[in-house]
Amino acid sequence: MLAVPEMGLQGLYIGSSPERSPVPSPPGSPRTQESCGIAPLTPSQSPKPEVRAPQQASFSVVVAIDFGTTSSGYAFSFASDPEAIHMMRKWEGGDPGVAHQKTPTCLLLTPEGAFHSFGYTARDYYHDLDPEEARDWLYFEKFKMKIHSATDLTLKTQLEAVNGKTMPALEVFAHALRFFREHALQELREQSPSLPEKDTVRWVLTVPAIWKQPAKQFMREAAYLAGLVSRENAEQLLIALEPEAASVYCRKLRLHQLLDLSGRAPGGGRLGERRSIDSSFRQAREQLRRSRHSRTFLVESGVGELWAEMQAGDRYVVADCGGGTVDLTVHQLEQPHGTLKELYKASGGPYGAVGVDLAFEQLLCRIFGEDFIATFKRQRPAAWVDLTIAFEARKRTAGPHRAGALNISLPFSFIDFYRKQRGHNVETALRRSSVNFVKWSSQGMLRMSCEAMNELFQPTVSGIIQHIEALLARPEVQGVKLLFLVGGFAESAVLQHAVQAALGARGLRVVVPHDVGLTILKGAVLFGQAPGVVRVRRSPLTYGVGVLNRFVPGRHPPEKLLVRDGRRWCTDVFERFVAAEQSVALGEEVRRSYCPARPGQRRVLINLYCCAAEDARFITDPGVRKCGALSLELEPADCGQDTAGAPPGRREIRAAMQFGDTEIKVTAVDVSTNRSVRASIDFLSN
C-alpha cells in the first residue's frame, strides 16, 4: 500500500490507484477545518461501476404535484389500483372557456408575509384589492423560472413580488407546496378515511429535465420545509423530469386519445382491425374514461396501441413545451419490459409560453413607453395582473388560420393612469406610435390583427423549432420518426401548426395527446408507481474531484509540479466519476474509498467539480467549476476495533454514488464496522 506523504496541506483522500495522493485545495478556493485528503488505499485501479437494484420505499398512495410556471395541480393513485389516476378537484374561479383542472401558479401573502391564498383565489383576491392596499401585499406569479435562471442559486436566494418587495425563494416555494399538500391530504382522507397519513404517501415533484442539480435540490429543500416528507424519510419524495413523465404517460395512450398533426391515424388503421373492445369490462373503462364528470382516468395495464406497434430499438422525441421552458428528451424503447433508455442528454431552453407574454409587454412598451409600463406595474400591480389575464384569454384563441381582429380589454385603471401620467389618452398614444397593427376601440379595447398576434409567438416558436432541429441533427438520435408534443403551451394552435410545417416535411410524425396540458401530471403519477421505467439516462455534465497524481514529465505541465519529501506530484488533477453524455444505468454505482485526514475526525467534506467537456484534465481548466460538496458524517470510532487490515489510525469510508437517477445520490459505509454512514451531496453551498 502506498504511503501517504506528509503534507501540511488540507486535502481529501480517495482510494483508487497507487498514482493518487492528497490534493491541496485549489487556488482561491475556501479551505475548511473538516476537509480531508485523498489517499490511495489499495494498489489497484478504480473499481468499475456496479449496478445495484435501487431500494424502493413502501407506500400506499402516490401523489404527484406538477409545479408549473403558469399553472399547477396534483393527481394521485393508490398502490392497490395504480391504473386509476384521480385528478384533483376542479378549482373555483378561473377564466371563461379554460378548463380548471389546474390552477394558476400564483401565490398571495399578506403584508406581514403570512400565507393568504394560492391559485385562482389568490389571483382574484389580489385583483379585487384597492390599488393602494394592493401595493402592500406580496403577490408572486410565474416564479418557477427564477430558479432556472439563477446562476448562483442558494437557500438564501430572494424572489421579488409584483410590488417589488422580496422574500426568500425557499419560503415562497414552500408556501405553494404546502398548499397542495393540505389539499391532497384532505381529499385522500375523504376518499379513504382509514388510510394512515404518516409514511404512506409517496410524493412526486415535477421539474424540467434541463434543470441542474442545484435547482433539483432546491425543490427538495422546499418540500422538506413544506412538510411533504422529512429528511429522515427522503426516499418518500421523488423528483420526476417533466418530459420523462410525459413519455411514461404516452406509453399508455390509445389511438383515439392521440392527434396526429399530419392528418394520419396514429396507428395507421391496422390496430383497429386487430383489436376490439369485446368485454363489458373494457367497455366500462371506456365509458369512465370519456365521462366529463369523472375525475378518475384509467390507463392501460400494459402499453397503449401505438406502443404495441413499436419494436425494440424504436426511437422518439418528447418535446415538453411548458410555460417557462421547452424540454427535449429522446427515448429508445426496450423490450420485453417496455423500459426506456435515454439516447441524448436533456436539452432545451427558456422558450415557453411566458415568452409570448414578454413579447406583448414589449409591444406595450413600444406604444406607451417603457418608463410608463414600469411605473404602472410598480404603482398599479393589481391592474397589471388584470391586463395580463385579459391577454392570456386572447392568446389562447390565436391560431394560424383565424380571421378577424382580437380585442384585448384595457383596465380602466390603465387608461386613467396613462392620462394622468402623460396628459393625453391612450388613443392618442396609439396614433403617435409606430405600431400600425394595433388599433383603439371606443369600447376600451386594443384591437390587434391576427397576424400581429401570431407575430408575438414567433420568437418563442422559432426557438422551440430550432432546438428540435438541432437535436435531430445529432448522430446519437438518428432514426427518430415520432415526436410527442406535450405541455401546456402545446395546446396552442400556432405552435402545433408551426412544428408540423417545419418537421412534417422531413418525415417526422408529430403527435399530440388530447389532454396535452395534463400529460405530465398523469405521467408523474405513473412514474411514482414505477420509477424504474427509465432504465438508462445520460449524464448532462462531467463530475469528479481533484487529486494528486505522480508527476510524469512530458505529460504533466511543469507549473503543476509539487515536490514533497523528495516525491514529485502533479496537483489539481481532475479525477472523473462520470463523463458528460455518458450512459448511466439506474442503480449503477461509482465507488470510492475515503480516509479522514486525522484520527477522531467526525466529518469528511470533499469538493465536487463539474464541467461540460468530457476530456478535462485539471480542476483549473476553463469550464471546470466547483459545483458541490460531498459530506460524510462519522460516528466516533471504537478504540481497538478491527480495522480489516488497515494501518492503525486509518479509517476507511466507502462511498457509492449513483448518477443514473433523476438526482445524484450517495450512500456510504464504514468498512471497519460495516455500518452505514450518513452521506449527502450539497449543490447549494456555493
Curated annotation (Swiss-Prot):
UniProt-annotated stretches for the region Disordered: 12-53
Protein origin, superkingdom: Eukaryota
Modified residues (Phosphothreonine): T42
A GO BP annotation: endothelial cell migration
Gene3D superfamilies tied to this protein: 3.30.420.40, Actin, Chain A, domain 4
Molecular-function annotations in GO: ATP binding
Residues bearing PTM Phosphoserine: S25, S29, S44, S46, S276
Keyword line: ATP-binding, Nucleotide-binding, Phosphoprotein
Tissue-wise expression: Highest expression in muscle and heart. Lower levels in liver and kidney.
PANTHER family (UniProt xref): ALPHA KINASE/ELONGATION FACTOR 2 KINASE, HEAT SHOCK 70 KDA PROTEIN 12B
Family per record: Belongs to the heat shock protein 70 family.
Protein name: Heat shock 70 kDa protein 12B
